[in-house]
Structures are given as C-alpha cells and as structure tokens.
C-alpha cells in the first residue's frame, strides 16, 4: 500500500488530511500531512519533509503538493530526486486526494496517474442550481 503525504502551505495540508479521514475513516494510517508555515525557510521545509518520509517507514510514498513551483513543491522535488519509491503530483485538490485514498493499493506509478486524473476530472465549470440529474456543466 502506498502512503500519501500532503505537503502544502499551512493549514491546507492538515485540512485536506482531515477531509480524507472524515470521508474515509479507515485511511488514518495512510494519509499524512506537512503544513508549511510562512516562517520556515526552504531548507527547513526540506529537512522536515525528509524526516517525515523517514518516519513513515521507507515504503512507497505519493507526495501531493499544493502549487507547482512554490516552496512545498521545490522541497518535495529535492527530496524525491533519486528516491525511486516516491512520486510527486502538484495541484492537490479534494477529488485528487479521494482518488488517491481509494486506489492506494495500486502500484506507485498507477496511483500517481490516477491521482492526476482525479484532480483534473474534479475541476469543471458549473452553472445553475443543483438538480437531481447532476451538475449543469458549462463548456464549449
């Protein structure tokens, strides 16, 4: 089973972890969070991220970060470089997280692909009031 680690600007990581555990209570051991406060310099983020991954036992880890190019992402890129049992996906959202929790038994590469698909599929324009037939999607 792949362990999930959410790394994001504080308090987003722990908030997303709480959402995952609210909907999937059995995932408590498999979803971890690292909130990055504005006061941490980049080297501190990287140090804490390395320590958290080490404490998770050395298995496969899918890291979900909030924004590509931001400090949490750069730290995760540095930590995952040369570490074959980690994958990194940027742009975490709730659909991505839920998909990751549901498919944590997949291989690491397959899970990263499913996480990306879940995140992308969960972003769509919606118009109008809710209905029993589903959302009204606005599109081309």
Regions found by a protein language model. Give the residues of each.
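N-terminal loops that bind phosphate or other acidic moieties
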Residues: 1-140
């Amino acid at each position: 089973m792949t362990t999930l680690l959410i790394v994001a600007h504080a308090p987003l990581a722990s908030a997303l972890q709480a959402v995952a555990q609210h909907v999937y209570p059995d995932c408590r051991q498999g979803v971890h969070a690292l909130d990055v406060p504005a006061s941490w310099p980049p080297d501190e983020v990287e140090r804490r991220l390395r320590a958290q991954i080490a404490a998770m036992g050395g298995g496969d880890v899918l890291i979900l970060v909030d924004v590509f190019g931001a400090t949490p992402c750069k730290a995760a890129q540095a930590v995952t470089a040369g570490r074959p049992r980690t994958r990194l996906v940027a742009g975490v959202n709730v659909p991505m997280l839920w998909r990751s929790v549901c498919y944590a038994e997949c291989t690491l590469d397959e899970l990263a692909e499913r996480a990306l698909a879940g995140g992308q599929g969960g972003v769509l324009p919606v118009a109008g009031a809710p209905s029993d037939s589903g959302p009204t999607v606005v599109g081309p």
